[in-house]
């Protein structure tokens, strides 16, 4: 060996020992020699001795260059078949050599698609994958960190010592290493050394499972092997238009719906108790439910209530309960607070078996600064903008994704596909879209940068959202993509090919604010604010709107829905019932937050659970019964949902009676031509002879009344229905002479089979 080669070996050994080597394959593993022989070099820090096992041969390996580089000469290329017997710390074990597996994991096409931002299944390459290479089982680790000086895998496999498993840098800033013999369930992180010599320990951005908070390591976890039973559901979903279907969503937070006692642990399939995950310091005796327990309790509850979908506040991994899940660190993993990825799959599968769709909140707008997360990932601003004027949400303390970087955009778009592909979810709600669309969002003058045209629109975020929605519907045509967009940005729910953002639903924030402002008023003053309850119809067909009363309206001192209402307790319940009924009969799909379905009194608390004891009291039972019946009515009457986004589906009868705070309208369905008449009285004053015009003579059955006694009302009504009279009003020749209960909403349906003879009262 020449002095030059010896100097190289000494330098390489020093770089390996100091975790500074970016190409260990150049030194380690089988190395061809000029004379046709091969030298095998094994990197074994702190080993006392290593024996090469090649076929039937055993030969001791020497350390001519460094005490941790063991080598032996062989006549032919040994491939990957050889093993090493390692003696370290008084313990002997055998293993395959990680640096014998030299073939690229990321192929040329993978790298090309990733670099241009179009690898829709990049998670199949990135991250930790249990697989076989050359017939040898193990785990392939793959990471994107283009600015790193070196990267090592650390974890249970090497006592968290970054010297043991340095990764190989490939083209495009990709780092790879196959660790043979590594089993699932192992904890790991990446130790990243920057060009300046700083060392960071990062969780895997593409990790499929992570430790339970407060621990932050990634967990080697498989993707395959779960047996789905929802093929029919998925086929039906993707062959139909969700906008033509009834959608009533139960928004919820899994960790605060209900808790279990910490001394009653979840029992695994093998009979062993699972370590409880504490609910909160404020409830030391409580634990979080597991995904299987939630499936047993939540799914029957939601089905009994009649909701069509569950919307889960973020179930991606997050370190801080107080973020409600909106500060994500594990984008490709369901949170381990409630169990394993396969247990979450089973939860979704059971939802589908019971006819319930699953929507998750997706947060591509920002991410937290936690040291184990994406922030300053490889010593540079890799995932975020370097300039804080476009890279930080100062008010939230989070960082903003750099949507102009192809690989970052690919990370997010593929993540969207991942949740539909791997977990069979049915929809997403994108949080805080307005914060993405505007560069000056929550920023004073001088603390934001204009776009290339001098405007405040974030054109990069617009292009990202368009790409994400285009790719989503390309792969999953029956999906729901819901925007929480609080401004008047145009064409949010229009297709991307005509310049829209590509969502198919948008939360109607204007409707929500107008309704709550109206219902919080003393009923006497409502006559001066009639516009609040009628204005939404003027713009409701500009987008595909979803009406939402969400978690944001029952926190931070806003009180819960029931306590927003004026008056005594009876009026509070009646107002709540009237608001929900108006919501269900107004055009647009529906979402309410957990607890509203039975009149929760307290604000939502992420560290608590719902006030289930309230269901011991009749008024709360009444609200719950009404919501059950509302959902039943809603799903059974296509006039309430078929033409939500067509002007044919709604027609005012009278929206101008502000003196009485009464409105009346029709919901119509184009396929069958059926219609419903809706009449609402938003004051505590009942009316015994209130006339409402209708388009067709006949008998109108009262099919719903929020004032029914079973809901906690005064039981005023119209004896099941009324015939019309030839009394012209509201532009119609026939009308109904109705009794309007206080603070109520009623629904009538024309019944051509019933007699037109007057009903005796």
From Swiss-Prot:
Pathway: Glycan biosynthesis; glycogen biosynthesis. The keyword Transferase applies. Signal peptide: none annotated. Its EC number is 2.4.1.18. SMART domains: Aamy. Pfam families: Alpha-amylase, Alpha-amylase_C, CBM_48, GlgB_N. Catalyzes the formation of the alpha-1,6-glucosidic linkages in glycogen by scission of a 1,4-alpha-linked oligosaccharide from growing alpha-1,4-glucan chains and the subsequent attachment of the oligosaccharide to the alpha-1,6 position. HAMAP family: GlgB. This is 1,4-alpha-glucan branching enzyme GlgB. It comes from Synechococcus sp. (strain WH7803).
């Amino acid at each position: 060996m020449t002095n030059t080669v010896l100097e190289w070996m000494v330098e390489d050994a020093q770089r390996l020992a100091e975790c500074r080597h970016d190409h260990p394959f150049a030194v380690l593993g089988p190395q061809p020699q000029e004379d046709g022989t091969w030298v095998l070099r094994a990197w074994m820090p702190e080993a006392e001795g290593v024996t090469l096992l090649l076929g039937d041969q055993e030969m001791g390996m020497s350390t001519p260059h460094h005490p941790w580089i063991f080598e032996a000469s062989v006549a032919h290329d040994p491939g990957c078949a050889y093993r090493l017997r390692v003696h370290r710390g008084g313990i002997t074990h055998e293993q395959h050599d990680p640096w014998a597996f030299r073939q690229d994991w990321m192929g040329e096409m993978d790298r090309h698609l990733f670099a241009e931002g179009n690898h829709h299944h990049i998670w199949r390459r990135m991250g930790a994958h249990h697989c076989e290479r050359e017939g040898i089982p193990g785990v392939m680790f793959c990471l994107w960190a283009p600015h790193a000086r070196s990267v090592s895998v650390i974890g249970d496999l090497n006592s968290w010592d970054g010297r043991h498993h340095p990764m190989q840098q490939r083209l495009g800033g990709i780092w790879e290493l196959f660790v043979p013999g590594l089993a699932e369930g192992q904890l790991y992180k990446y130790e990243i050394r920057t060009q300046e010599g700083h060392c960071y320990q990062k969780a895997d951005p593409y990790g499929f499972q992570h430790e339970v908070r407060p621990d932050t390591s990634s967990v080697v976890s498989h993707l395959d092997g779960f047996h789905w039973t929802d093929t029919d559901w998925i086929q039906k979903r993707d062959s139909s238009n969700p906008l033509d279907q009834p959608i009533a969503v139960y928004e919820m937070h899994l960790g605060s719906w209900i808790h279990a006692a910490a001394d009653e642990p979840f029992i695994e399939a093998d009979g062993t108790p699972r370590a409880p995950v504490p609910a909160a310091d404020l409830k030391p005796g409580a634990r979080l439910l597991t995904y299987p327990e939630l499936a047993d309790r939540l799914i029957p509850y939601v089905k009994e209530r009649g909701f069509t979908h569950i919307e889960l506040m973020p179930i991606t991994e997050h370190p801080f309960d107080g973020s409600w899940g909106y500060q994500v660190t594990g984008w490709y993993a369901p949170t381990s607070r409630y169990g394993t990825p396969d247990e979450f799959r089973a939860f979704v599968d059971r939802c589908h078996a019971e006819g319930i769709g699953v929507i998750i909140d997706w947060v591509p707008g920002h991410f937290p600064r936690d040291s184990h997360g994406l922030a300053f990932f490889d010593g540079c601003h890799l995932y975020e903008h370097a300039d804080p004027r476009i890279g930080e949400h100062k008010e939230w303390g989070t960082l903003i994704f750099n949507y102009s970087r192809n690989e970052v955009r690919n990370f997010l778009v593929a993540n969207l596909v991942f949740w539909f592909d791997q977990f069979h979810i049915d929809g997403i709600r994108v949080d805080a879209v307005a914060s993405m669309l505007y560069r000056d969002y929550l920023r004073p003058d001088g603390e934001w940068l204009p776009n290339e045209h001098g405007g405040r629109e974030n054109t990069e975020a617009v292009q990202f959202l368009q790409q994400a929605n285009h790719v989503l519907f390309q792969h999953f045509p029956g999906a729901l993509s819901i925007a929480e967009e609080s401004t008047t940005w145009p064409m949010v729910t229009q297709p991307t090919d005509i310049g829209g953002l590509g969502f198919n639903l948008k939360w109607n924030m204007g409707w929500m604010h107008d309704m709550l402002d109206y219902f919080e008023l003393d009923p006497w003053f409502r006559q001066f604010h009639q516009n609040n309850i009628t204005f939404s119809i003027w713009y409701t067909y500009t987008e595909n709107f979803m009406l939402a009363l969400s978690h944001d309206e029952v926190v931070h001192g806003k009180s819960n829905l029931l306590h927003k209402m004026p008056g005594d307790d009876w009026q509070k319940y009646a107002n709540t019932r009237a608001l929900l009924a108006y919501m269900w009969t107004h055009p647009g799909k529906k979402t309410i937050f957990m607890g509203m379905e039975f009149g929760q009194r307290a604000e939502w608390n992420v560290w608590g659970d719902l006030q289930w004891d309230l269901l011991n009291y009749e008024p709360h039972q009444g609200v719950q019964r009404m919501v059950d019946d509302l959902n039943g009515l809603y799903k059974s009457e296509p006039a309430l949902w078929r033409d939500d986004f067509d002007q044919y589906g709604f027609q005012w009868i009278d929206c101008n009676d502000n003196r009485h705070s009464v409105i009346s309208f029709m919901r119509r369905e184009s396929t069958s031509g059926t219609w419903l008449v809706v009449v609402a009285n938003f004051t505590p004053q009942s009316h015994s002879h209130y006339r409402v015009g209708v388009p067709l003579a006949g008998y109108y059955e009262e099919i719903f009344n929020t004032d029914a006694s079973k809901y906690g009302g005064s039981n005023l009504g119209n004896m099941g229905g009324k015939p019309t009279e030839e009394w012209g009003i509201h532009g119609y020749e026939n009308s109904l002479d109705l009794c309007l209960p206080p603070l109520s909403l009623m629904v009538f349906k024309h019944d051509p089979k019933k007699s037109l003879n007057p009903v005796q009262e």
